[in-house]
Amino acid sequence: MSGEKIKIVLLILGAFVIGSLWTKVQYLEKTKNQPPLPTNNVAQAPSDNGAPIKVSVDDDPVLGDKNAKITLIDFSDYECPFCKRHFTDTYPQLKKDYIDTGKVKMVFRDLPLNFHVNATQEAEAAECARKQGGDAVYFQYHDQIFTKTTSNGTGLALEQLPIIAKDLKLNVDQFQQCLDSGEFKNEVEKDLADAAKVGATGTPTFFIGRSTADGVIDGIKIVGAQPFSAFKAIIDEKLK
């Protein structure tokens, strides 16, 4: 290859490298201030750094004794496979050992991921069930969704939502009207906004702390489908 051709090749390669670097810089500049998108969480380390985070229970449904010493806040998505894994593998023991015994109250807050197409409507449906039957019925509806869904996108057919309401002896016409009207759209969106504020960027994300009069706890963060032992260690420490 002649010297002239070598120069041309080097110039082309140099231009390509510079162009690639420029594109990368532009992309990083564009995305550096954007919040991370919510994701499904596999089992990860129990917390970010162990430092408590202030998190509110808001006005969301409570399972267990409202005067329990410990509050567990659960930010979840009804179509998240790791949320379902928590529901099947960890939640039953948590409920038996801590919630049913009055030591812990669990507050469920919605974090439907935008790539789970039915998750938002399922969250609103559970709120419509709560409107008729209170927190007890809310968690019955919650349990039915997690039991029936295949999770992760395919999920639960929306036609099943009023059927679950009927099975729970709710007024199906009132339920459907509530769901169709989007009555609880803002409620779900507020949960999403609050989740972002406390760094709950994936599902499930939990916060455990001592209960307070105003409902704002200093919560230790647990991320992902953790085993029962991860929850037990934090709860037992908080109960001392």
Q: Each PLM stretch: what is its role?
A:
Residues 1-42, 162-240:
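C-terminal cap of thioredoxin/glutaredoxin-like
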Residues 35-53, 57:
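Short extracytoplasmic/periplasmic juxtamembrane "stem" segments immediately C-terminal to an N-terminal membrane anchor
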Residues 53-70:
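A short beta-strand-turn-helix
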Residues 57-61, 91-93, 192-193:
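A generic local structural motif
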Residues 60, 113, 149, 176, ...:
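Conserved short-loop catalytic and cofactor-binding motifs
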Residues 64, 73, 223:
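Residue-level detector of conserved, well-ordered beta-strand and adjacent loop positions
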Residues 68, 73-79, 84-166, 171, ...:
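Structural alpha/beta surface segment adjacent to cysteine/selenocysteine redox centers
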